[in-house]
Amino acid sequence: KGNKMSKSTGNVLDASDLLDKYPVDLVRFYFMWKSSPIETLNFSTKELMSRPYQILSTLFHIHLYFKQNSEYDKFNINEKTVDWAKDNDMLSSADIWLLSKLQKTIELCTKLNNECKFHESASAIEDFLINSLSQIYIPITKQELWNDDETKKNRRHVIYAIIAESLKTLDVLIHPFSPFTSEYLYTTIFGDKKSILLESWPKSTPALVNESIEESFDIMNEIVSVCAAARMKGK
């Protein structure tokens, strides 16, 4: 519910104190994620350290996951791209599903930013990062990445290409909200340019959108969620 900030009630937050205690990018992202142009904002440091922190932490750890595994596998990020995988007909259903989700996220974030609906844009980034990339794609491809069979190397490189494309796009999409974090992650992992500010804004590729595979995956994920909930209830 919240109360109005007032000096007399002693609930005013000093910006310098807030930024001494919490990362500036986390505070920035929280405000953009939380703020609606038509609603008052109930500020909570507890909420700040919950979902917004999880979003930035997940983004960081997937970059780390990609870096550790791709370097071990000697993956060349400039040679093995999504186009390479697509042209050689090496995309699995999971790859196609994630790429399709990514194109829609690009379109949605671009539209919402142009309409100054930044809180909805931040939520769209959250949805793709957490619900699609982190909770579905990474888990279902993990065993393939950890298969050291040399004959499966191309498959592993396809997965790296998909993750790299997703992360690079997310870095640019989230940059207006969390510039220091995205700059660090981009230059550490990709470094195509001296700064992420020199990157172009992502554009969706309609040819990568696949409605039928998206629908099939969404149904499958719903079934898995229901089964998991039933299993937890039965314990």
Model-predicted regions and their roles:
Residues 15, 27, 52, 56, ...:
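Short runs of predominantly hydrophobic/aromatic residues within well-ordered alpha helices
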Residues 44-49, 126-127, 151-160:
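Conserved short loop/turn motifs at secondary-structure junctions
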Residues 12, 42-49, 104-125, 170, ...:
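Extended, non-catalytic structural segments that build the interaction scaffolds
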Residues 32, 53-67, 92-105, 122-145, ...:
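Core structural elements
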